[in-house]
Amino acid sequence: MDDGNDDAITPGGDDAGNNPFAGMPLFGDLSRALSGQGPLNWDAARQFALLAASGGDMAGAMTPGGKVLVPTGNIEPNVRIKYAELAGIARLHVADVMQLTVIESDPEVATPEQWAAQTLDAYRPLFNDMATSLGQTSDDDGSNDPMMQMMAGLSKMMAPAMMGMSVGSMVGGLARRAFGVYDLPIPREGGFASKLVVVPPTIDNFAAASDIELDEMRLWVIAHEMAGHTLLSIPHIADHLRSLVQRHVGAFRPDSSAMT
């Protein structure tokens, strides 16, 4: 009699040898839930990114529907206006030094949480490539030991969630230190490629801690962001950098000998 469960969790299914919960419908459902988003669990990545970016305040960070909410207060309108004013000065300087066309739009402002969410989306293909390469297994990793087979299956099941936690924590940690998009000199694609984004709370805190006049700090950050955007908007430079990063993340391999 067909109980409605697919072959992945029944004895004799194609993955039965690698699934530690084969033949156990309840745990099979858990297995699919943990790995249901592919090589990286993006729900976990977003939640851990917001947790790290907000310094541990996850209250209200995620709704039951998964919509990202921002715990930190919005940036004041006068701060947005100030960055727009300074952008004109920075634009003239960067254009004069680089002798290239500089982006005309004013910089957007973001909280660390918003920066983290945007960065996860912008680099999603790279993180997926990295998770895929780390999730690969070689033929010589097999073992006739049932316990080793079960542990290997358990590790494979948990890998997407663990990768999501690791990636999210890393991006969230960076969000608390980043001044803008081009702190990471990695080209972004799609709609993210045309944006300048600065993080006023982090900039303000650094200026205060380093005893730097706030407008001077803001001007430096805007000039840095415009220079990075101008350079990485050159197609052959952006394509080459992107290919180098993709090659690097695609070359990762898991080391089973490290688990001894």
Give the label of every model feature segment.
Residues 1-129:
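N-terminal low-structure segments adjacent to metalloprotease catalytic domains
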Residues 203-221:
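Short pre-active-site segment immediately N-terminal to the catalytic Zn-binding motif
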